[in-house]
Amino acid sequence: MSIVSNTGPLIALAKVNQLRLLEVLYQQVHLPPAVHRELLAKTGVEAERLDQALATFIRVADPLELTPEVQAATLSLGAGEREAVALAHHMRLLLVMDDQLGRQAAQGLDLEVTGTASVLILAKQKGLIESVRKLLELMREHGYWLSDELITTAAELAGEE
């Protein structure tokens, strides 16, 4: 199974050195060019982790011409979100995105959407990680914005206290 990802989930997982979860769970991740450009702008250890993933299981797609339907649904989004929605729509793949407006646009196009927390819940169900809460809290400590409510809900869904 392959997926399309937006920038946010990749950065969040890179922050806690868990990009491998995407490879184990989904085998291949597809990125639109705008997301690739956003990832190339990262520096430090995150950039090194992202570079390793780009060299192995992440594929950068060719630019797509947006259909009128996708254009209309994604008018208020940034380039990365817009292109990620368009690529998921074109390839008919699951979209991994945390941005709320982007998720709404994708759902309006009848796309299946998941987020970083759901990826971690699935990873825990498959025995790949021990704690969803700990990883989400670590992401937040490293500057990835996550609400208390999201962390609590995800931990509960993962069967954690």
Task: Set out the residue ranges of the language-model regions.
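Active-site-proximal, substrate-binding regions of enzyme catalytic domains
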Residues: 1-93, 100, 109-111, 134, ...
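Mid-chain, well-packed structural core segment of small domains
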Residues: 97-119, 125
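Hydrophobic alpha-helical interaction segments
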Residues: 115-158
